[in-house]
Curated annotation (Swiss-Prot):
This is UPF0756 membrane protein NMC1845. GO terms for cellular component: plasma membrane. Keywords: Cell membrane, Membrane, Transmembrane, Transmembrane helix. It is a multi-pass membrane protein. The chain crosses the membrane at residues 13-35, 50-70, 80-100, 121-141. Belongs to the UPF0756 family. The keyword Mitochondrion does not apply. It comes from Neisseria meningitidis serogroup C / serotype 2a (strain ATCC 700532 / DSM 15464 / FAM18). It comes from the Bacteria.
Length: 148
C-alpha cells in the first residue's frame, strides 16, 4: 500500500491558511485537495501547465481595474519626474525582474515551492505579512541557490 503525504500536506496548508487568515492558501489548497480526491484529478496537469499564467493574468486585471473604474488616475507626465514616482517605477521594474527569476527556479526545482509556501504561511500567520510572496521569494531564493 502506497501512502502519499500530499493530502496531509494540503490539509495542513488549509489549516494554516485558516489560522493565518490567508484565504489564498486556504482556497487553493482546498481546491487542489478536492481535485486530487475526485475525478477532477484528470485536470491537475492542465492547472499545472497553465495555472501560473492564468493567476498572473487575474492578478494583473485586479491591479489595473482601479484605472478602469476611475478609482485611480493615470498621473500627468510631470508627476513622473518626482523622486517618489521615479523610485516607484524602478522598484516595480526590479520586483518584476526578481519574480521573473523565480518562475524558472520554481519550474526547475518544484520541491522548493513547498518551502516557499511554508515560509509564506508562517510570515502571514506570525509576522503580520501578506501572501504575495512566493514568486518574489523564489526570485530571492534564486540568488541564494543559483538560477537553476
Amino acid at each position: 500500500m502506497n501512502f502519499s503525504f500530499v493530502p496531509l500536506f494540503l490539509v495542513t496548508l488549509i489549516l494554516l491558511g485558516v489560522v493565518s487568515n490567508n484565504n489564498s492558501i486556504t482556497i487553493s489548497a482546498t481546491i487542489l485537495l478536492l481535485m486530487q480526491q475526485t475525478a477532477l484529478v484528470q485536470f491537475v496537469p492542465l492547472v499545472e501547465k497553465h495555472g501560473l499564467n492564468l493567476g498572473i493574468i487575474l492578478l494583473t486585471i485586479g491591479v489595473l481595474s482601479p484605472l478602469v473604474s476611475g478609482k485611480a488616475q493615470v498621473p500627468p507626465v510631470a508627476e513622473f519626474l518626482n523622486f517618489k514616482m521615479i523610485s516607484a517605477v524602478f522598484i516595480g521594474i526590479f520586483v518584476a525582474w526578481l519574480a521573473g527569476r523565480g518562475v524558472p527556479l520554481m519550474g526547475q526545482q518544484p520541491v522548493l515551492i513547498t518551502g516557499l509556501l511554508i515560509g509564506t504561511v508562517i510570515g502571514v500567520a506570525f509576522m503580520g505579512g501578506i501572501p504575495v510572496g512566493p514568486l518574489i521569494a523564489a526570485g530571492i531564493l534564486s540568488f541564494v541557490v543559483g538560477k537553476g
